[in-house]
Regions:
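Acidic, carboxylate-rich catalytic segments that either coordinate divalent cations
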Residues: 519-585
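Structural motif
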Residues: 43, 47, 99-108, 410-423, ...
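ATP-dependent adenylate-handling active sites, centered on carboxylate activation for C-N bond formation
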Residues: 64-67, 75, 155-393, 438-484, ...
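Cysteine-centered catalytic environments shared across enzyme families
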Residues: 1-248, 526
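Charge-dense polyanion-binding interfaces
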Residues: 91, 106-107, 114-115, 469-491
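PAPS-dependent sulfotransferase catalytic core
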Residues: 306, 484-544
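Short, hydrophobic/amphipathic alpha-helical patches that form generic packing surfaces
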Residues: 110-118, 275-282, 422-433, 549-566
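Glycine/proline-rich, flexible active-site/cofactor-binding loop segments
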Residues: 14-22, 26-42, 63, 374-421, ...
């Protein structure tokens, strides 16, 4: 949805009548690469089409069949539904829901708030009756039958060295072609490895305006120091530092009037930081940036989830797994035996059984003082802090949803690889909503090269336990980006936290946030206890320990539900065709 004519390209097959490849979105492929993909697809090999550079929708039409798929991360998703004797599909779920007035799926929303390690999305969308095509799969139309969802070809597993060489090539392509395609290019320059690497690759092609955001809490941390050093030592960078104190922006500002907020297809964490994003993107908007490049997704593909230790054990690297579990316990400040016990339990438990245990756990009331434990990161699946807000009806809904995933879970044999994919899909959705908001409000297109299909595939082809090294931050980046970015950047060992800034925002915006929780639609549906959520909110407002991530997610979920009253109506998306509605092929 929403792709301009210039973002859509069609390539015909010279040897197969009626066969053509169409892409919509940020496809960075050359004419030669597209022709090679068409030739391979004509022979039955969709691999080259899947890995065309960029992040986009692809439709391969043979005349008798049509294969429709988004990117491998989920930035450009595909949704579909049956209606009026036909099949309708789109790259957004909201218009398909508006077609029939389908309501949001509140169990889906609860799952998004309360579960980790559960693939509850799979083929389920955020609206009832709307189905989702999982990233890495295609919606396949044959004649007039109901379409099939078919897995697309995936590449082989790689070693760190081989994957790093591939990453070096595809990431350079992803950034370089974006930089060359836009007249004016801007970048995020947080000072971290990810955004700094993207900035360095972009400025190798043309001068860029790089923006660093800071505030009173972050000004003395390493991010700003590294960003300034990058700007000073790498030629071609015009550096702007945006200080929240000057911009008068805090977390959760601007939420007093939900009807004035931008609409998104999914709940978006960006709604909780809108004025901060506005300040950060103001220089890009002012200069007419045609592409604002970010490092989003870098943490997902360059690093590894905590559960990589379990994958190492399952791959036969048992001593390595226990040593890394000991390191994990030290960082979490817990006894090593607790991490060892969870490691052993996870390796001994198949994923379907772990799901059923979680479903059984959620069916019963949680203790009043319950909070997720650090060792949950080593489990297949677990509940988040938001699970403590569920009512009996909410617990039943989530328990049933988790149980429904059990029959589909047998193919997963390693939790680290599963968490890699789920975390990547979540970040892809977040990026897509951020991009939609930035285009709506400030006219700035946001790019995340690390989320491109080819880039993510190169990284995730390496087992997660290979992408982690004790005492080495993002070892994959060190190997892949050597001599492309300054060596001292790749040896950075610190990461700035934003916790204190979040507390400041909660306190400053307490009245508006209290109103959002008090008017909770999930609570009105009997699924969530607003009093318990409000108690955690009050703790955060007072600067006491609180589940900040869960509160942020709940607030934006409630805002999303509020906006749907006008954003998901039929008239907002559809108008009658002169001769009646025409279903998509």
């Amino acid at each position: 949805m929403g792709h301009a004519t210039g973002e859509c390209t069609v390539t015909e097959s010279p040897g197969q009548k009626g066969a053509r490849l169409m892409t919509a979105g940020h496809c960075l492929a050359t004419a030669a690469e597209r022709q090679a993909a068409v030739a391979a697809a004509s022979r039955g090999d969709l691999g080259p089409a899947v890995l065309l550079p960029g992040s986009h929708l692809t439709v391969w039409h043979t005349g008798s069949q049509a294969w429709v798929f988004g990117d491998g991360a989920g930035v450009v998703p595909v949704y579909w539904r049956e209606h009026e004797g036909g099949v309708w599909w789109a790259t957004a779920a909201t218009p398909l829901a508006a077609l029939t007035g389908a309501p949001p799926d509140l169990a889906w929303l609860l799952a998004d708030l309360t579960l980790t390690g559960v693939d509850f999305r799979l083929q389920i969308a955020q609206f009832k009756g709307v189905r989702r095509v999982p990233p890495g799969s295609a919606l396949v139309f044959r004649d007039h039958a109901v379409p099939d969802v078919v897995r697309l070809p995936a590449g082989p597993r790689s070693t760190l060295g081989k994957g790093a060489r591939r990453l070096r090539d595809v990431l350079t392509t992803a950034v370089t072609r974006r930089a060359l395609a836009a007249e004016r290019v801007t970048t995020d320059l947080s000072g971290g490895v990810d955004s700094s690497s993207v900035t360095c690759l972009a400025v190798a092609q043309k001068p860029v305006l790089a923006v660093t955001y800071t505030d009173a809490r972050m000004a003395g941390d390493d991010d700003l120091l590294f960003a300034r050093r990058i700007a000073a030592e790498v030629g071609g960078i015009t550096h702007r530092v945006i200080d929240a104190r000057d911009a008068q922006a805090k977390h959760f500002d601007g939420l007093e009037d939900p009807d004035a907020l931008p609409t998104t297809d999914l709940p978006s964490m960006s709604l909780g930081v809108l004025p901060m994003l506005a300040a950060r993107l103001a220089p890009a908007a002012a200069c007419g940036s045609g592409a604002h490049l970010t490092g989003r997704g870098g943490d997902n593909v360059l690093a590894a989830p905590s559960s990589h230790r379990v994958d190492a054990f399952l791959a036969g690297r048992r001593l390595q797994a226990f040593r890394r579990a000991t390191d994990f316990a030290r960082v979490c400040r817990i006894e090593p035996w607790r991490a060892w016990r969870q490691l052993a339990a996870t390796t001994a438990t198949p994923y379907p059984r772990a799901l059923q245990r979680l479903a059984d756990q959620l069916a019963d009331p949680l203790p009043a003082t319950w909070r997720p434990a650090p060792i949950d990161a080593l489990a297949w699946c677990s509940a988040t802090a938001a699970a403590s807000w569920l009512t009996p009806a909410g617990r039943r809904a989530i328990s049933q949803l988790v149980s429904s995933r059990v029959p589909h879970a047998g193919g997963h044999t390693a939790p680290g690889a599963l968490h890699d994919r789920l975390d990547l899909e979540w970040m892809a959705g977040e990026h897509a909503t951020f991009d939609a908001i930035a285009r709506q409000l400030w006219g700035v297109p946001i790019h995340a090269p690390f989320l491109d299909t080819a880039v993510a595939a190169a990284c995730l082809s390496i087992p997660p336990f290979e992408r982690a090294r004790p005492g080495v931050y993002k070892p994959l980046a060190r190997v892949a980006l050597a001599q492309l970015v300054p060596d001292w950047l790749l040896t950075r060992q610190t990461k700035t936290l934003f916790t204190t800034s979040v507390f400041d925002g909660l306190a400053a915006n307490a009245p508006a946030l209290r109103r959002i929780i008090a008017g909770s639609r999930l609570a009105a549906a009997g699924l969530l206890d607003a009093r318990q959520a409000a108690a955690d909110l009050e703790s955060g407002i007072a600067g006491a320990p609180a589940p900040l991530g869960a509160l942020h997610a709940l607030l934006v979920a409630e805002l999303w539900l509020t906006r749907l009253t006008t954003a998901a109506t039929h008239t907002a998306w559809w108008q009658p065709a002169p001769q009646g509605s025409i279903p998509c092929p």
